[in-house]
Design a protein with these regions (language model features):
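N-terminal loops that bind phosphate or other acidic moieties
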Residues: 1-195
Length: 195
C-alpha cells in the first residue's frame, strides 16, 4: 500500500528485501490464499492435497466454519466449490466488507464472550448436521477463536450462564486451556460434541 513511500528514502535495497520478505510471509499467512493453494476442483472432483472426493456421488456438500480467520477460509471454499456447494454456515468475529459468499450464511458470533447470533448459528449447524446422512459431505474450516464463537450451551444452561461463566474466567486470568476445559462441559458444540 505504501511501498513507494517506504522505498523513497534510506537504504532502498535493504528496504526492498525486507518488504519482499514481509509480503511473501503475509501471503503465506493469508487463510484465503492458503486454502486456494491446497484445494481445487477437477471437474466434479474436489482435490485437497493428495485427497480426492467425487462430489457427483454426494447428495449434498456442506461447508461449516468458525473462527477469527473463518471469513477468508470459508470464502475460499465457497468459491472453489461453486455450484457443488449446497449450503454453508460460517461463524466469524467480524464480517468484512470484502466478504463475498455465494451459498454461505455468515453469522457474527461473540468473542471473547458468546452472543445471541453465535447461538443462532450453532442451532442452524446442529439442524444441518442432524438432517445429514452418509451420502452428504461436510467441509469444516476452523481457526483460532472458534470455541468462543461457537456458543451453544447444553440443556439446562442458558446463554447468559455461558456468558457469565466465560466473563468470570477471563477476569480471573484463566488461560485458554482452562477456559476450553470448562466450555467442553457446558457446550453442545465444543470438545467434540458436534461430531
Amino acid at each position: 500500500k505504501n511501498r513507494e513511500a517506504l522505498l523513497s528514502h534510506g537504504d532502498i535495497n535493504g528496504r526492498k528485501i525486507v518488504l519482499d520478505i514481509t509480503e511473501k510471509t503475509l501471503q503465506h499467512l493469508d487463510a484465503y490464499e492458503r486454502i486456494k493453494s491446497i484445494a481445487h476442483m477437477e471437474g466434479d472432483t474436489l482435490c485437497i492435497g493428495s485427497r480426492r472426493w467425487d462430489l457427483s456421488k454426494k447428495r449434498n456438500v456442506y461447508l461449516l466454519g468458525a473462527g477469527k480467520a473463518c471469513n477468508h477460509m470459508a470464502m475460499a471454499v465457497d468459491e472453489i466449490l461453486g455450484d457443488h456447494l449446497t449450503r454453508g454456515i460460517a461463524i466469524v468475529k467480524i464480517k468484512e466488507d470484502t466478504d463475498v459468499f455465494r451459498k454461505t450464511d455468515v453469522y457474527v458470533g461473540g468473542h471473547p464472550l458468546p452472543n445471541e447470533e453465535g447461538l443462532r448459528a450453532c442451532k442452524e449447524i446442529i439442524k444441518l448436521v442432524d438432517s445429514a446422512n452418509e451420502d452428504d459431505l461436510f467441509i469444516v474450516v476452523i481457526s483460532g477463536g472458534s470455541s468462543a464463537l461457537m456458543s451453544c450451551p447444553i440443556e439446562g444452561i442458558t446463554l447468559q450462564d455461558e456468558i457469565d461463566t466465560t466473563d468470570v474466567m477471563l477476569k480471573s486470568g484463566a488461560g485458554i486451556y482452562e477456559i476450553n476445559a470448562i466450555r467442553r462441559h457446558i457446550s453442545a458444540m465444543n470438545g467434540g460434541m458436534l461430531a
